[in-house]
Amino acid sequence: MSWGSSAAKFLASASTVLVVRWLRRHSQQRALLRVWSAKRRPVTTVDATIRLPKEDLDPDLAGCDSVAQLHERIAKLGLPPLVPREMHRCSVSLAGRARKLLGLTTSFTVMQFNLLAEGLSSGPHVEPPFGRAGVKPSGYGGFDAVARPEVVFDWSKRKLRLVEEILRFLPDVLTVQECDHFADFLLPALRTAGYDGVYAPKRHSPCLEFGYHSDGVAILWKKSAFAPIGSERRYFIEDDGSESGRPYLLALLRHRECDSTLLVATTHMKAKLSQPNEDLRAKQITQLLDALEESAADKADAVMLCGDFNTDPYDEPGKQVAKCVPAVLGHRLGLRSAYPLPRSEHNGWWTTWKKRGASEVKHTIDYIFHSSGLQPTSVLAPPAVDDLEEARLPSIRYPSDHLSIAAEMQMP
């Protein structure tokens, strides 16, 4: 048999597979749309433990109807450029490269970003939305080593810098945490770039202690790349069966080009290293993984779990035995990390690096996990140390104490 006839048979077989896959997915998605639409729970302010901004639109976005206008407003801030970042190529198998060459796979990008809530970083001179009576005094989130804090933490500037960081990479899927201005700022700002999204606020958010709005988690997607099938907001369950104040969010998306379905989940785990906190993180992440497994069964072609887990991948001697990340990697879903998982802070990969008082911490605590059918082809590397300020993050050149992390993925 000639090479040409073999290639023709291979391509014909591949075309048949694609047609069958398309028909199967469309029949599934019609049923899924009914199920997920019934599950979806809108975010309201009826819950007294949640406080959301009353304004429909941030006044600073008035008249801003395009990405170009948004960039103009960012430029008017007169701040230095954001720290440079580059994508780092991953090793891709020969089969993966061949599938891409033959058009049998589709690429998309995903970004994970803890925004650093306004309510957890505002200055002492700023009047909180709900007043100062009975609340803790704010003090730039304890970032006392940051130079020019009155500029770095000025929300009118920092919110635009956060959007600038997102727009310079334009991810197809975006997951965020510590978002306390979703409906009034983040979503309308990113809608100018063609995004839509869903949001889940925390109950009893720590931001309330300072007189600010509740923070929460969100999933956004570029409408030109993905169509939403449905979303669901849940809260972790306590030992007594009641709902906790900590949410997680699921969104089922259909890729417009290849028609594959992607189930995305995000959450923000409890902070601070300690064994009791790590035990709680492991217990709660197992709840989320089980929910993902249930939702993904016969419904999603691929799964992604992104978030700020507030824990390292490995043991911290004298502080905690790692359980949370091992629970993810050992679960039946078979998730993998898009990024290398460093064993020490001296490794070049990290997601947060900050100074508070005499304390300096450098950790990997933000993650992008994916199912085996997805193949990362590149990931967003941390900035060079020489490009960071003495106080590391945040700074005049970076708007959060967490780096955004991002990966380009091949989708089957």
Language-model-derived ranges and their functions:
Residues D60-S107, F113-L115, W155, V173-K270, ...:
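Structured beta-strand-rich core segments of catalytic domains in phosphoester-bond hydrolases
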Residues S121-V126, L187-P188, E209-S214, R233, ...:
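Short aromatic-enriched loop/helix-cap "lid" or pocket-rim segments at secondary-structure transitions
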Residues S2-A12, L18-A145, L187, A193, ...:
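Acidic, histidine-bearing metal-coordination/catalytic regions of metal-dependent phosphoesterases
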Residues K9, T44-K100, D172, F182, ...:
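Metal-dependent phosphoester-hydrolase catalytic domains
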Residues L115, M269, D308-F309, L403:
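Active-site metal-binding loops of divalent metal-dependent hydrolases
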Residues D154-L167:
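Short, acidic/polar
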Residues L115-K157, P206-E209, D240-S242, K270-L280:
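Acidic/histidine-rich helix-loop elements
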